[in-house]
Amino acid sequence: MLATWKLLVDRDCGSKNKAGVDAVGQDVKGILESAGFKVRFYEYPEAGNLLIAERGDTTKPFVALIGHLDTVFADGEAAKRPFTIKDGVVTGPGCLDMKGGVTVLLSAMRILNEAGWDRYPVKVILAGDEEAGHQKSTAVRDMMAEAKGALFGLNFETSFKDNSVVIERKGVATFRFDVQGIGAHVGNNPKGGRSAITEIAAKVADINALTDYDEGTTLNVGVIGGGTVPNACAEKAFCVVDVRYKGEAGITRVRAGLKAIADKVYLDGTHTEVTELFYFPAMPRLESSLEL
């Protein structure tokens, strides 16, 4: 088990390193094949491949075991911080998120195979671009299709230090506001410009006001920018908004609210577009999850 953990941690496999992620996928493929699985991949040109491994007849209700192979770390991190055990604690890039979880999954499958356990068919689903939000692949669609027909799913992503089990998770969405103003020299033509920065600054307060803690919905304007030089009225400005929400009612309200904010004009002569860059659905708490 430790040897497998070390093997996975000591490979550079950040989301941008497709070759590294795919190499980890091949490592995992070999281990799962030795545990009786048939392995195949969804191949993506610009993202780590999606690994699918099956044991038993998965046309019948099966158990889905889910996770990812990539990390957030840049190339070279594995050499700088290799797999290390000190005072009973493992360190190294991705040792927690989620090479440890993948190692537990692989070890469990090996042990169950050796014990002859075959009560249910099993399907392993391991993404290669989770940390990048699957933005350059069709992995979300492909994983949902592969998970269809499962009795239940277990995600091997790391939980919290108290070893609790996560049975619900907020959804995430990202939006970008782009404001078009009118550029002008602030010395020669101080009244001629329409500052995109002024417009977007007014909108930031409106965006933040959409937060509803009781509903479980929060918004954060985490990135903002605009203009080029201090002596010119900013012709363009932008901001990027992170949204966390518990249910579809929350994200539906936020979408409508952000569109209304974009359409509202504080400074005549400016125009704003809002674009939804990313959306990941929430995992609601279900009675069936509590029973499981």
For the regions a protein language model found, what residue spans apply to each?
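Acidic/histidine-rich catalytic neighborhood of metal-dependent amide-processing enzymes
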Residues: 98-170, 212
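Metal-dependent amide/peptide-bond hydrolase catalytic core
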Residues: 3, 13-14, 23, 27, ...
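Residue-level recognition of beta-strand->loop/alpha-helix junctions
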Residues: 43, 126, 276-278
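Short glycine/serine- and small hydrophobic-enriched flexible loop segments
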Residues: 7, 106-114, 202-208
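A structural signal for isolated positions on well-ordered beta-strands in alpha/beta enzyme cores
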Residues: 64, 123-125, 273
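Short glycine-aspartate micro-motif
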Residues: 62-64, 90, 151-155, 176
